[in-house]
Amino acid sequence: MIRYPVTMTSTVRPRHRQGPARLVGGVPYSDRASTLSLLPGAAVGRWLARQAPLVCGRLLDLGCGNQPFLPWYGPKVAEAVPVDAAPARGVLQVDLAGPLPFPDAGFDTILCTQVLEHVENAEHAMGEIARVLRPGGHALVTVPFLYPTHEAPYDFQRFTHHGLAGLVRRHGLEVAALDAQGGPVLMLAHFGVLALTQVLRLLRLADNRVLRALVAAPQEALRSRVSTRLSLPARVASLGYMVVARKPL
C-alpha cells in the first residue's frame, strides 16, 4: 500500500466519512456505526464481492473518502492509490473536475463507488477513468438513481442504467456487466429507514446504541438476500446501478 502526501487544490468540500467496511464471508458491508441504513451498502458490497477476481495489480480508489473498501481490496492488489476531492489523512487530494495527475494506462483496476453524482461533468470524469485505465483493465463504477440528495450542495445528477451504460461506451469502454442496487422493495425500505432516522434525530435519539441496534438488526438479517440482478422492476426503480467497464486490448 502506497500512501501519497496530501496536495491541496482549490476544491475543498465536506464529505461523509464512512467507516471501514466489515468483511463477512468476503463481502464488504457498511460500517454500522456510520449509518443507520445498511441495505444500500449491502447491495454494493455483494456486487463488489462478485467482482473480486477482476481486482488486481495497481488500483485507483477514485473518490475514496476515507477508504471504506480498503479492508476488501487491500490484500488483492500490489498497490493502491487513494484519491479524493476532500482532504483526508493519507489520501491524495485532487480536484475531480480536472485532469487526474496520472499518466495514461497507469492502473489495472479503478474503483469509483457513488462518486460521479458529485462531479458536475461526469463525461469528463469518465474520460479520465478511461484514459488512466490500462487496456484489458476494469473499472468498477456504482452510481445512484432513485436516491435522496446528499452531501449538498455537491450533488449534481442521477443515472438510469441506460445513462450509465451510455456514459461508459462513449469513452471507448465495454460494458462487461450491468447490475442494480436492488429493486423497488429495497428502495422503499431505504427511504423508510431514512424517515425513521430523521425522527430519531428530531428526538435526539439517533446516537442511542440500543435504538441503533434495533434498527440495524432486521437489515443485518436481510443483507445476504439483497439482489443486484438487473430485473425488470429494478430497471424501473432502483437505488442505483453498477457497471463493470472493461478497456479493450
What residue spans do the PLM features occupy?
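Short, cationic motifs built from Arg/Lys/His that form the positively charged side of catalytic pockets
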Residues: 40, 131-134
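Conserved functional loop/turn residues at catalytic and ligand-binding sites
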Residues: 101, 106, 114, 137, ...
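Glycine-rich, phosphate-binding/catalytic loops in enzymes
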Residues: 76-80, 98, 127-129, 156-159
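A short SAM/SAH-binding and catalytic strip from SAM-dependent methyltransferases
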Residues: 108-120
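Conserved N-terminal segment of class I S-adenosyl-L-methionine
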Residues: 1-105, 109-111, 235-242, 248-249
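S-adenosyl-L-methionine-dependent methyltransferase catalytic module, highlighting the catalytic core
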Residues: 34, 120-124, 128, 138-248
